[in-house]
């Protein structure tokens, strides 16, 4: 690799890291709580208040209710253990906990990238830093604190453990023992792991039996450790008559949707490496960017061409076993050529298994989030393709590197624009959190009454812990929340217009309401007597008046 290319790659790497870190923290600031996010937050805060970590994780099906004691849940305490730990570390401040969460994601990403450098070289490091660190799916995972998206970060660790196990070196025994435990932890965040990557690993070990038997004892140790990770769940289930487990079985029996209607979005394997989020379909992209900037459509199209080409080239080379270029693995830019090939073999093995298993086991095919466990491994097709271009198509390789520079700026801009309306909701939620949190701290344990629209009573119930939420009719303090109608964030009061799915036009905690838990729209602000009250706090959208009642 020449010195000029080295310098260019270092610049690309530096810019990718800077943009990734800045964007991750910037986007999380105003990330919004959706319906299932609020459910997860409520369940977490209940565990935080009682100092008891739930033995189950997130709800398998969004129920539409914030409180639902009969919801079917993911087995295992991993999700809420992590959630509560970060919340406790932040001393019960939701937005501080989100900063810790983003930091943890980035630390794991950087560990993965450092490992990439030592195993595959500078070119691989720079390319993956650009593709993964500045990636819409990664940004979504990082900013959605209350969803079980840490499977994305665990996918980085799984690739490291799996690759080190394959290297057959001094510490391969240790990594062999860690393979199943890391998947068990993933499974406590998202149960779809057991319909995809877990059976893929088992079948892979069978296919590579001659190698697997060498580490059988350590693999078995890993299975035993995985069992221990689920032991608390099993103990509670035995005590309550396998309540949650039976609900899971019944849910599976009741799920009668034809498989062709719930076919797994296995295309996520390719989409992960592209410019866009899978949930923003082509029509949305064309409608949005087609008017604003046709150039962006071209950039997005190029990202899909690169992703598809990487997939095809890798498939030909790994599955059809045809060397596109006899020197493709001969140079030092991609060291560990056998390791790269084996990782890609696992990648392609996953695809049919992730399709067949939900069909056979009557599982839900699910969306792209069901394949987060393979997020990190999805990018190894890009590495092989980049190596192919470097040797076979040097001019295209130069264009590829130029596109990387465009990519890292365009992706962050694209994510910002696509999520602009949602960020307005998130900002309103953050200001709502700020105002009720300030009231709870100001009351300092004294009973109080809140005069406002009912949405704030709901926010206080959701966000304040037991010590802070001392709302009572027998109160010593009264608070009035006023809304700044001149603020650019203020549009309409909460009414049926929110059902038009224009969330930026209404102050809501999430951008759609379920009739089951929609707060009333009653406004008690007019009942507050401003005499002898003082303005104690304001933010961009709200203000708080306080009045202490005479004893």
Predicted regions and their residues:
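Transmembrane-helix motifs of polytopic, lipid-linked glycan transferases
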Residues: 14, 99-124, 157, 309-314
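Transmembrane alpha-helical segments
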Residues: 19-24, 385-390, 400-426
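Transmembrane-lumen/periplasm boundary regions of multi-pass, lipid-linked membrane glycan transferases
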Residues: 40-46, 197-306
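Loop-to-helix entry region of an early transmembrane alpha helix in multi-pass inner-membrane enzymes
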Residues: 77-84, 89-107, 141, 293-302
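Hydrophobic, aromatic-rich transmembrane alpha-helices
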Residues: 107-111, 205-206, 284-340
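Short acidic/glycine- and proline-prone juxtamembrane loop motifs at membrane-interface regions
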Residues: 137-150, 191
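Membrane-interface alpha helices of multi-pass inner-membrane proteins
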Residues: 174-191, 224-228
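Hydrophobic/aromatic-rich transmembrane helices and adjacent perimembrane loops
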Residues: 195, 338-393
């Amino acid at each position: 690799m020449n010195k000029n290319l080295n310098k260019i790659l270092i610049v690309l790497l530096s810019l990718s890291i800077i943009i990734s870190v800045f964007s991750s923290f910037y986007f999380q600031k105003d990330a919004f709580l959706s319906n299932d996010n609020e459910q997860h937050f409520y369940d977490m805060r209940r565990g935080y208040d009682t100092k008891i970590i739930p033995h189950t994780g997130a709800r398998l099906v969004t129920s539409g209710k914030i409180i639902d004691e009969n919801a079917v849940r993911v087995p295992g305490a991993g999700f809420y253990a992590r959630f509560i730990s970060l919340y406790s570390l932040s001393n019960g401040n939701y937005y501080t906990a989100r900063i810790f969460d983003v930091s943890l994601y980035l630390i794991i990403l950087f560990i993965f990238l450092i490992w990439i450098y030592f195993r595959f070289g500078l070119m691989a490091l720079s390319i993956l830093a650009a593709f993964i660190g500045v990636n819409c799916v990664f940004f979504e995972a990082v900013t959605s604190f209350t969803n079980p998206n840490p499977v994305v970060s665990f996918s980085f660790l799984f690739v490291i453990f799996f690759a080190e196990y394959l290297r057959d070196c001094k510490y391969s025994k240790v990594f062999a023992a860690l393979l199943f435990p890391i998947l068990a932890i993933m499974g406590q965040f998202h149960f779809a792991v057991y319909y995809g990557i877990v059976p893929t690993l088992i079948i892979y070990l069978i296919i590579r039996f001659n190698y697997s038997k060498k580490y059988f004892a350590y693999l078995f140790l890993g299975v035993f450790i995985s069992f221990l990770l689920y032991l608390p769940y099993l103990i509670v289930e035995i005590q309550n008559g396998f309540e949650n487990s039976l609900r899971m079985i019944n849910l599976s029996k009741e799920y009668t949707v034809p498989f062709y209607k719930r076919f797994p979005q296995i295309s996520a394997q390719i989409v992960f490496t592209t410019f866009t989020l899978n949930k923003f379909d082509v029509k949305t992209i064309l409608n949005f960017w087609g008017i604003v900037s046709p150039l962006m459509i071209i950039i997005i199209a190029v990202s899909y061409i690169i992703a598809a080409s990487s997939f095809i080239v890798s498939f030909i080379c790994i599955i059809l076993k045809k060397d596109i270029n006899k020197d493709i693995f001969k140079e030092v830019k991609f060291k560990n050529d056998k390791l790269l090939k084996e990782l890609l073999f696992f990648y392609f093995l996953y695809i049919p298994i992730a399709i067949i298993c939900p069909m056979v086991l009557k599982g839900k095919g699910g969306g792209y989030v069901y394949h987060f466990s393979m997020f990190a491994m999805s990018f190894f097709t890009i590495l092989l393709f980049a190596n192919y271009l470097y040797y076979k198509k040097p001019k295209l390789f130069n264009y590829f590197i130029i596109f990387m520079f465009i990519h890292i700026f365009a992706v962050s801009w694209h994510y910002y624009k696509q999520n602009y309306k949602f960020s307005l909701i998130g900002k309103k939620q953050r200001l709502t959190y700020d105002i009720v949190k300030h009231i709870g701290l100001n009351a300092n344990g004294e009973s109080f009454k809140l005069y406002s629209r009912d949405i704030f009573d709901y926010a206080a119930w959701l966000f304040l812990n037991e010590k802070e939420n001392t709302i009572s009719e027998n109160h010593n303090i009264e608070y009035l929340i006023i809304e700044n109608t001149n603020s650019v964030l203020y549009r309409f009061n909460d009414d049926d217009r929110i059902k038009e799915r224009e969330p930026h036009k209404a102050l809501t905690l999430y951008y759609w309401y379920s009739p089951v838990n929609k707060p009333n729209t009653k406004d008690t602000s007019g009942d507050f007597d401003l005499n002898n009250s003082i303005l104690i706090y304001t933010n961009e959208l709200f203000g708080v008046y306080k009045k202490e009642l005479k004893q």
